[in-house]
């Protein structure tokens, strides 16, 4: 009995061992299968990441992809430049009363004249400028202007805030007051802020170079133009205290001269737009270029706090607005040294039935500079 018992025990133990071995084998096979699946997934993810990276690289590469018979590339990595930037802004208010009397008030903040060095890498320029004309006005005005130009895409960002440092320029429609009677008179009844961002696409970017005219990173060799398409957003805030105007414009008692339409206190609105236009670079001599572009925009204007339904939005033309961005550039560039000037103007319009506001933001740049650190492929 003991022997039989021992034999049976051994047989059971052997059977149990086989089951354990089979279970271990199954577990090992499952681990191998999971490992294979994981490795396959990782390879798939790596392929996806590599493909996405290649697509992104080609997309970025196309920023400066052009026909070299029309456009000479930048042979250098870096740029040093000295620039003079002149900026000025104009606000024009116009009101018309029920009797048809039209009055306008034009005013400007103190213009800024800035000089400073810039350092560039490819399309990106960084620098610092000093206001040499009105250093005391710095505390009353904040200004930031950024533009990016590449062969295919470009963008503009503007932030300007002015608090009380305005001067009257022109007044019309006021009885007994000449157009220039209060020219350059202080006006502390206006605070204003402008924020704007826009981006655009250059259709004929292989032959037409925006950078050649406005950031000197390439040289246009043959005259050429291109259609432009963009979109953007802007916000305007204007706080207006008409009682700060000269008493001759306001009148007294029953002899009130200013129309009610100009007695507003605040305007604040958002503007969402699309824009289209055309740019042209004229090569009028070797290494010499004159560029011009014009981009009007149309979009929806929404007053702050205003809620509009779809039918109200599109049936009332007063909810639509029209703005414009214009550029001019004159450049001499021999691919190592360069000098030139550019003018950029942004016009923002606001209209109601008997009131309109025009805000014009303008920048004029004069510059001279050179390139250095030649790229490896051009050494």
Predicted features along the sequence, with ranges:
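Sec-dependent signal peptide cleavage junction
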Residues: 7-72, 376-379
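Outer-envelope beta-barrel architecture signal
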Residues: 74-80, 113, 122-124, 142, ...
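Membrane-embedded beta-strand positions of outer-membrane beta-barrel proteins
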Residues: 80-82, 117, 126-128, 155-157, ...
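Transmembrane beta-strands of outer-membrane beta-barrel pores
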Residues: 84-90, 121-125, 130-134, 150-152, ...
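Outer-membrane beta-barrel translocator/channel fold
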Residues: 85-89, 93-98, 104, 158-196
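Surface-exposed strand-loop-strand hairpins of Gram-negative outer-membrane beta-barrel proteins
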Residues: 88-114, 125-137
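Extracellular/periplasm-exposed beta-strand and loop segments of Gram-negative cell-envelope proteins
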Residues: 104-116, 168-172, 181-194, 238-271, ...
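Outer-membrane beta-barrel "beta-signal"
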Residues: 196-199, 360-379
């Amino acid at each position: 009995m003991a022997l039989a018992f021992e034999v049976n025990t051994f047989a059971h133990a052997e059977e149990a061992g086989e089951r354990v071995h089979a279970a271990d084998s199954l577990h090992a096979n499952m681990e191998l299968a999971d490992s294979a699946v994981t490795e396959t997934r990782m390879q798939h993810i790596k392929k996806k990441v590599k493909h996405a990276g290649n697509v992104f690289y080609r997309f970025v590469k196309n920023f400066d992809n052009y026909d070299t018979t029309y456009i000479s590339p930048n042979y250098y990595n870096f740029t040093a430049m000295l620039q003079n930037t002149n900026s000025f802004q104009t606000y024009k208010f116009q009101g018309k009363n029920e009797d048809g009397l039209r009055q306008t008030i034009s005013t400007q903040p103190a213009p800024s004249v800035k000089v400073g060095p810039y350092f560039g890498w490819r399309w990106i320029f960084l620098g610092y400028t000093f206001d040499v004309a009105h250093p005391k006005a710095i505390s009353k005005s904040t200004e930031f202007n950024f533009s990016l130009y590449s062969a295919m895409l470009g963008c503009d960002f503007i932030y300007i805030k002015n608090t009380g440092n305005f001067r009257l320029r022109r007044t019309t429609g006021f009885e007994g007051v000449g157009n220039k009677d209060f020219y350059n008179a202080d006006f502390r009844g206006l605070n204003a802020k402008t924020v704007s961002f826009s981006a655009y696409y250059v259709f004929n970017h292989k032959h037409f170079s925006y950078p050649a005219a406005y950031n000197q990173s390439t040289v246009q060799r043959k005259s050429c133009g291109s259609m432009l398409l963009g979109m953007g957003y802007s916000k305007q805030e204007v706080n207006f205290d008409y009682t700060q105007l000269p008493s001759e414009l306001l009148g007294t008692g029953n002899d009130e001269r200013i129309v009610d339409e100009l007695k507003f206190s605040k305007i604040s609105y958002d503007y969402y737009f699309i824009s289209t236009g055309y740019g042209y670079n004229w090569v009028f001599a070797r290494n010499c270029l004159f560029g011009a572009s014009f981009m009007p925009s149309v979009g929806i204007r929404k007053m702050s706090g205003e809620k509009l339904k779809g039918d109200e939005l599109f049936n009332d033309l007063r909810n639509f607005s029209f703005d414009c961005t214009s550029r001019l550039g004159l450049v001499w560039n021999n691919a190592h040294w360069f000098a030139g000037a550019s003018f950029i103007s942004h016009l923002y319009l606001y209209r109601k039935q008997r009131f309109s506001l025009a805000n014009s933001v303008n920048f004029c740049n004069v510059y001279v500079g050179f390139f250095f650190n030649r790229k490896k492929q051009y050494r």
